[in-house]
A protein has these predicted regions:
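Long, compositionally biased stretches enriched for glycine and/or charged residues
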Residues: 1-118
Length: 118
């Protein structure tokens, strides 16, 4: 707020929609990049390309997140299963059948909020 009010730029690590700030990650992903804040708003800084091993590591988290967003937009239950199956931690400890069962239990537990998911 101080940077906005005083127009003295302040640098933070901000979470923003990628929009090409990190070239080798999906543009629709949320990424953390350096940002300058001033009276005119938040100004993300282009980072360029990450070393491929780091980009690959990031994509293991980004891919299930993008599928979860698609599931929310389309109300497609199978996309929820797919997102959970691609999650590195979930896939590391549960079988496919256990993942489907867990997702079904969570969807059922949220009742009215998730009633449209087919």
């Amino acid at each position: 707020m101080e940077a906005v009010v005083t127009d003295r730029p302040y640098k933070i690590g901000g979470n923003v929609l990628n929009n090409g700030y990190i070239e080798n990650l999906p543009s629709e992903a949320c990424v953390e990049v350096p940002c300058y804040i001033d009276a005119r708003g938040v100004h993300p800084v282009k980072v360029g390309r990450l070393p491929e091993q780091l980009a690959a590591m990031n994509r293991t988290n980004i891919n299930p997140q993008l599928l979860a967003i698609e599931a929310a937009v389309t109300k497609d239950r199978s996309k929820i299963y797919q997102a959970a199956m691609l999650d590195p931690h979930t896939a590391g400890v549960l079988s496919i059948d256990e993942i489907v069962r867990m997702c079904d239990e969570l969807i059922d537990a949220h009742g009215e909020y998730m009633k449209d998911y087919k």
